[in-house]
């Protein structure tokens, strides 16, 4: 039926059957030539689902200008359809969000490290994701040119989310970019007259409201708010980072869940500081790391936890879980927020191993390269606010732990020693604990053990 209609239309245009046959034959040749669809060898196929449709049967008379325009329209349409299909055959690859750890389900796309059109190498970072704990890089799966980003900065993404399309060859990228720009130019052309038509309508509405503006109520309201305007102009509103949100949530949950109580004591740092100054050079020559005060407090905390195992325990529902291991978390303040890496097996480490672990974890935390596994777990936390000059504080428990030890600055104060008043380097220490699980007696005994070990480190050698 369609063939008869075409023959009748050709006859009505004054062309003979022989002429139509020639035009039909020429149109078939034109349809099979590469000029109709660049990039195809024998013809264009459009894949939809599991079916392939050939366009060789679009025979168009060469003498008809209207049909020629239709042919060009079909050609341009097929070109746009084939490009995404060719991308699926291996011309492009997709960069996706990697696995971020068992305890992290999503993150925020913090920033793009590359721009569309830039060339990237395989495994080169193109974007960064900020999670509750660490910052993770999204790497390019192959070398090529970034065609486009599929998400925006600030979007919440999950593992497997497609972030960018990367073209393996520059030719494919150059073919896609013009097709993406065409709809932008066509969309922008009709918009100006529409805006021009809407402008007089928008202007007409305020004209009617203008006489109502200079009424008596507005002036007193503005005069009342005038003193508040200058402070607002000096304010800055910055969205919270994922890490800051997570820290805020966990600390508030800790405050709402635990029965927090803090007990204090003071420690004479004379002997520990003397030990450090006496052996710091030999310690560095042998172990390649400086001897600090933190390792002495870690060893003292381990000894106190072994004497008071309930401080190392945790409440789980109606049960108490006693941990037979000691994993010490250390609070590290960074420019992005507070992170708490873990010294695993601290009860089996010596001073050198503890110092090396602390330096390594602190360096990774400040550089933002610390992994999630290095911050997971922990049975007890030690926080040193003394490095910032804190004299005394009440630290908050890091859940799901039950206690935290707070160190503070060393201050020379007059103390009575042997009946005489002498200056001594003193430090206040604080233990915040969950009073649901830990009684005051255990908390005081814990701090007394820390005090005894720090003031007389030889107790560790004799195990007394």
UniProtKB/Swiss-Prot annotation:
Pfam families in the cross-refs: 2-oxoacid_dh, Biotin_lipoyl
Annotated EC: 2.3.1.61
Record domain Lipoyl-binding: where: 92-167
GO cellular component: cytosol; mitochondrion; oxoglutarate dehydrogenase complex
The record's free-text note on cofactor binding: Binds 1 lipoyl cofactor covalently.
Active site: residue positions: 435, 439
Catalysis performed (reactions): N(6)-[(R)-dihydrolipoyl]-L-lysyl-[protein] + succinyl-CoA = N(6)-[(R)-S(8)-succinyldihydrolipoyl]-L-lysyl-[protein] + CoA
Skewed-composition ranges (Polar residues): 172-189
GO biological process: L-lysine catabolic process to acetyl-CoA via saccharopine; tricarboxylic acid cycle
Region named Disordered: 167-243
One Gene Ontology term of the molecular function aspect: dihydrolipoyllysine-residue succinyltransferase activity
CDD domains: lipoyl_domain
Primary site of residence: mitochondrion
Enzyme class: transferase
Pathway entry: Amino-acid degradation; L-lysine degradation via saccharopine pathway; glutaryl-CoA from L-lysine: step 6/6
Residues that bear N6-lipoyllysine: 133
Transit peptide stretch: 1-85
Cofactor(s) needed by this chain: (R)-lipoate
Keywords from the UniProt entry: Acyltransferase, Lipoyl, Mitochondrion, Transferase, Transit peptide, Tricarboxylic acid cycle
Cell compartments where the protein resides: Mitochondrion
PANTHER family per UniProt: DIHYDROLIPOYLLYSINE-RESIDUE SUCCINYLTRANSFERASE COMPONENT OF 2-OXOGLUTARATE DEHYDROGENASE COMPLEX 2, MITOCHONDRIAL (PTHR43416:SF41), DIHYDROLIPOYLLYSINE-RESIDUE SUCCINYLTRANSFERASE COMPONENT OF 2-OXOGLUTARATE DEHYDROGENASE COMPLEX, MITOCHONDRIAL-RELATED (PTHR43416)
Subunit structure: Forms a 24-polypeptide structural core with octahedral symmetry.
Function, as annotated: The 2-oxoglutarate dehydrogenase complex catalyzes the overall conversion of 2-oxoglutarate to succinyl-CoA and CO(2). It contains multiple copies of three enzymatic components: 2-oxoglutarate dehydrogenase (E1), dihydrolipoamide succinyltransferase (E2) and lipoamide dehydrogenase (E3).
Family that this chain belongs to: Belongs to the 2-oxoacid dehydrogenase family.
Protein name listed in UniProt: Dihydrolipoyllysine-residue succinyltransferase component of 2-oxoglutarate dehydrogenase complex 2, mitochondrial
């Amino acid at each position: 039926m369609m063939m008869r209609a075409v023959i009748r239309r050709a006859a009505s245009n004054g062309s003979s059957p022989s002429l139509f046959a020639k035009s039909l034959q020429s149109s078939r040749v034109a349809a099979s030539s590469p000029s109709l669809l660049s990039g195809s060898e024998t013809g264009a196929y459009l894949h939809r689902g599991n079916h392939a449709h050939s366009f060789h049967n679009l025979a168009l008379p060469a003498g008809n200008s209207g049909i020629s325009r239709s042919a060009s329209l079909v050609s341009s349409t097929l070109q746009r359809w084939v490009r995404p299909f060719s991308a699926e055959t291996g011309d492009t690859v997709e960069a996706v969000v990697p696995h971020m750890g068992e305890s992290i389900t999503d993150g925020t796309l913090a920033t793009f490290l590359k721009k569309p059109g830039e060339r990237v190498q395989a495994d080169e970072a193109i974007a960064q994701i900020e999670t509750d704990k660490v910052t993770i890089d999204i790497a390019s799966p192959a070398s090529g040119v970034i065609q486009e980003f599929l998400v925006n900065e600030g979007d919440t993404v999950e593992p497997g989310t497609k972030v960018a399309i990367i073209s393996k060859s520059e030719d494919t990228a150059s073919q896609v970019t013009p097709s993406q720009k065409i709809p932008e130019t066509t969309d922008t052309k009709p918009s100006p007259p529409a805006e021009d038509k809407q402008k007089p309508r928008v202007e007409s509405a305020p004209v009617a409201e203008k006489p109502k503006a200079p009424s008596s109520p507005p002036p007193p309201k503005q005069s009342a708010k005038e003193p508040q305007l200058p402070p607002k102009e000096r304010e800055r509103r910055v969205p919270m980072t994922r890490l800051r949100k997570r820290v805020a949530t966990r600390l508030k949950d800790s405050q709402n869940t635990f029965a927090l109580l803090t007990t204090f004591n003071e420690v004479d740092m004379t002997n520990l500081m003397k030990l450090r100054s006496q052996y710091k050079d030999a310690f560095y020559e042998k172990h390649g790391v400086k001897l600090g005060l933190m390792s002495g407090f870690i060893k003292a905390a381990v000894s106190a936890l072994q004497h008071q195992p309930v401080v190392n325990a945790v409440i789980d529902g109606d049960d108490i879980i006693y941990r037979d291991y000691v994993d010490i978390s250390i609070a590290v303040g960074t420019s992005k927020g507070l992170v708490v890496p873990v010294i695993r097996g601290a009860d089996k480490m010596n001073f050198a191993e503890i110092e090396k672990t602390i330096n390594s974890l602190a360096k990774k935390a400040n550089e933002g390269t610390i992994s999630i596994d290095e911050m997971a777990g922990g049975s007890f936390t030690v926080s040193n606010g003394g490095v910032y000059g804190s004299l005394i504080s009440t630290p908050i428990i890091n859940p799901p732990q039950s206690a935290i030890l707070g160190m503070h600055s060393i201050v020379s104060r007059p103390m009575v020693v042997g009946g005489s008043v002498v200056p001594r380097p003193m430090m206040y220490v604080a233990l915040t604990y969950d009073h649901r699980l830990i009684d005051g007696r255990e908390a005081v005994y814990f701090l007394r053990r820390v005090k005894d070990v720090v003031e007389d480190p030889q107790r560790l050698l004799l195990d007394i």
